Amino acid sequence: MLLIKNGRVMDPKSGLDQVCDVLVQDGKIIKIASEITEEGAETIDATGLVVAPGLVDIHVHFREPGQTHKEDIHTGALAAAAGGFTTVVMMANTSPTISDVETLQAVLQSAAKEKINVKTVATITKNFNGKNLTDFKALLEAGAVGFSDDGIPLESSKIVKEAMEEAKKLNTFISLHEEDPGLNGVLGFNENIAREHFHICGATGVAEYAMMARDVMIAYATKAHVHIQHLSKEESVKVVEFAQGLGAEVTAEVAPQHFSKTEALLLTQGSNAKMNPPLRLESDRRAVIEGLKSGVITVIATDHAPHHVDEKNVEDITKAPSGMTGLETSLSLSLTYLVEAGELSLMELLEKMTYNPAKLYNFEAGYLAENGPADITIFDAKADRFVDSHFASKAANSPFIGETLKGQVKYTICKGQIVYQA
């Protein structure tokens, strides 16, 4: 038995927000009350700390199989636990891609060994070829939770329509990475800084929001659910809002980096600040925050994208891979740039990091209730935290190293077990 005493218990599902005790047994929460005494229970003193549902991240890259020099499922799960996450959804752009039942089963076997809940999508098209759909039905039955070709946009509108129709038939959805290659230059650099500082043609805003406009309208026509991944532009928020206003089933996520920083970070952090989509303008940063506040964007997801130090430290920054490690800084960035900045209440933030992402996939997660799962994150929302280069992840490609942020995870509890302790 585990007894959590005197914490500020916050549950976005029920709206519970009060100082009380939580008793855990056999992977479940068995009691939430103002005062619980339990002889012999292991006790955590959570005085002054927030006791929240375990965080849920629906967009991570754990690089297994095929790229385990960057990360693997085990180190990814450790990074998740250190960041307060108890449930994550891996993307399928591995080597080989997760496009068939055999590869999926091997990945899920590896995931099952971890102390947190590690789930995965499968690809929309076979080996990312953009032309032939995978066997959605067989992959769902084998344990995939959804479908995404994240990393590579789907250029064929015909395939997008077919994928949406198939997903709708099976009561699932597809998640899309929106960057039209035909409208884009060098990825990872926003068009403004690319032109002015790097003297190259960079990643354009129109490549994101034009492709999104196509796909949300196909979703509208097919009455299918589409989830837009890591949007970054002011116009993109408007596109989602427009589609939702029409009655289309469109959901969207934003990554912490896109509401925290702008393209200028490339000048001080170099390749660690290079990502797809890129960091944008201050007007875009403000717009995605407004999208979170209005409810147009319902989910915060990291797009945790670890890379080996040698891959990032190349002479020509345009040759460095895009992406940053995100699981261990997500909560702190969100507390700093949303809650401390007065943009969202702590409860509103937690909803976008726990209940909403869990609800999207119908996971039994993201809430605190008696008889519910004992997936719990305990953190100090006010603590100052200096981000150093020591991560649980294999990778340290974070542009936030050296920054002081708000918020420190103290305990992560999954299935009733302490899986991380600061």
From Swiss-Prot:
What are its GO cellular component terms?
cytoplasm
Indicate whether GTP-binding appears among the record's keywords.
Answer: no
Q: Which UniProt keywords apply?
A: Hydrolase, Metal-binding, Pyrimidine biosynthesis, Zinc
Which reaction is recorded as catalysed by this protein? (S)-dihydroorotate + H2O = N-carbamoyl-L-aspartate + H(+)
Enzyme class, top EC level, equals hydrolase
Spell out where the chain crosses the membrane.
none
Using the chain's own numbering, where are the disulfide bonds? none
Q: Name one GO biological process term.
A: purine nucleobase catabolic process
The entry's active site is D303
Q: Which residues bind substrate?
A: H61, F62, R63, N93, N276, H307
Binding-site list for Zn(2+) 2: D150, H177, H230
Which pathway is this protein assigned to?
Pyrimidine metabolism; UMP biosynthesis via de novo pathway; (S)-dihydroorotate from bicarbonate: step 3/3
Its Gene Ontology molecular function terms? allantoinase activity; dihydroorotase activity; zinc ion binding
Might you give the EC number(s) for this enzyme? Answer: 3.5.2.3
Q: How is the cofactor bound?
A: Binds 2 Zn(2+) ions per subunit.
As cofactor, the record names: Zn(2+)
The entry's Zn(2+) 1-binding residues are H59, H61, D150, D303
Indicate the family of this protein. Belongs to the metallo-dependent hydrolases superfamily. DHOase family. Class I DHOase subfamily.
Record function comment: Catalyzes the reversible cyclization of carbamoyl aspartate to dihydroorotate.
Question: What name does UniProt use for this protein?
Answer: Dihydroorotase
User: What would be the name of the gene that encodes this protein?
Assistant: pyrC
